[in-house]
Amino acid sequence: MSSSRPEPGPWAPLSPRLQPLSQSSSSLLGEGREQRPELRKTASSTVWQAQLGEASTRPQAPEEEGNPPESMKPARASGPKARPSAGGHWWSSTVGNVSTMGGSDLCRLRAPSAAAMQRSHSDLVRSTQMRGHSGARKASLSCSALGSSPVHRAQLQPGGTSGQGGQAPAGLERDLAPEDETSNSAWMLGASQLSVPPLDLGDTTAHSSSAQAEPKAAEQLATTTCHALPPAALLCGMREVRAGGCCHALPATGILAFPKLVASVSESGLQAQHGVKIHCRLSGGLPGHSHCCAHLWGPAGLVPEPGSRTKDVWTMTSANDLAPAEASPLSAQDAGVQAAPVAACKAVATSPSLEAPAALHVFPEVTLGSSLEEVPSPVRDVRWDAEGMTWEVYGAAVDLEVLGVAIQKHLEMQFEQLQRAPASEDSLSVEGRRGPLRAVMQSLRRPSCCGCSGAAPE
């Protein structure tokens, strides 16, 4: 006689005994043949119900009849109690994500007309427990349902048992418990029925995270496992990846794989800056099955491959974009800012020009305080006329001190120019002044009219 015990979840209800809940609550529980009517899902609950016909008529093991297992005992006060029954039932809720089923009806559902499985897009976790002759092995099936149709019907058949040295089919194994417990993970997707025959792996060993399942004794039966056709997705836990283990994925035929949706940064794990690097290779023992090994890498252990560029998933920026440019400096066009050339500044017309800085910064700088070294002069340009007597100041306030300095510099410059002039220019200027006077005096002494009249023939 087998019974089911729901695994206590982090949000398990703290009720001393099992009580029926209304449809507005977080979960609905259907049990027995009397409660077989088809129930429709609410916003946060799902009911799975299986028939108990064949389970009650099957013979039971004598060891189990004599000594009921520990799962028959009432559960703790922290979780809901499980009632012993000849068959099994499925119970799923979004709060606990716990599904239980009897050992005799392991992974077997009726036709869609008998029990309709209606669920939301939330993850549905189903766990089964079965006691053996000499040891206990626990197999849990974790299914993540993602699809366009809210109603998915699947019919799973129990796999066959192996003989001496037999081992449970390890198509999807992960999270081995210390008590030699094997768990299988699968993704179920689709609106049609899925029927998967049992897999016989033979001597194929399954890679697991903690330990491998050792062969049982000759008289021990291996646990019955269920295999569904999952999408081509890798179902590994972070605990298995940290241990450096490998998990196996079964290829899907005609099933569209949807990525898992994440709602927050903490759920996606981007703030931890951890990633999973997956290497897949085809195995020789299983044709059509790929062995995928996942390795965990962090910020310290990241070794980029040659020719590859790693970018942050959240900001989509690489480390080279944020690092200072060493090989190729950034230009103004890369940043999208057109930097105008800095013109040479002059305090006054006679002062030496200030050289522009050698390198222009790409982005504009904002300075709140004025530095004492780069104080601009209030006088930008001083223009003098030709005589040097009038002046105009542009772009500066009229200040007596500034004007006095400008006039003094202008007079000093003119004095230096007069001293540099050679003395020959002075002599030439004196001779140039005397030349016209001498020409006038000579013309007066010798009148041309008289000379011309006397010299002219009659």
Curated annotation (Swiss-Prot):
Disulfide bonds: none
GO (cellular component) term, any one: plasma membrane
Region (Disordered): 1-94, 118-172
Tissue-wise expression: Expressed specifically in the cerebellum.
Entries under InterPro entries matching the protein: GPRIN2-like/GPRIN3, GRIN_C
Biased composition (Basic and acidic residues): 31-41
Record-level GO BP terms: neuron projection development
Compositionally biased residues, Low complexity: 14-30
Subunit structure: Interacts with activated forms of GNAO1 and GNAZ.
Function of the protein: May be involved in neurite outgrowth.
Protein name: G protein-regulated inducer of neurite outgrowth 2
Organism whose genome encodes this protein: Homo sapiens (Human)
Record lineage: Eukaryota, Metazoa, Chordata, Craniata, Vertebrata
Gene name as annotated: GPRIN2
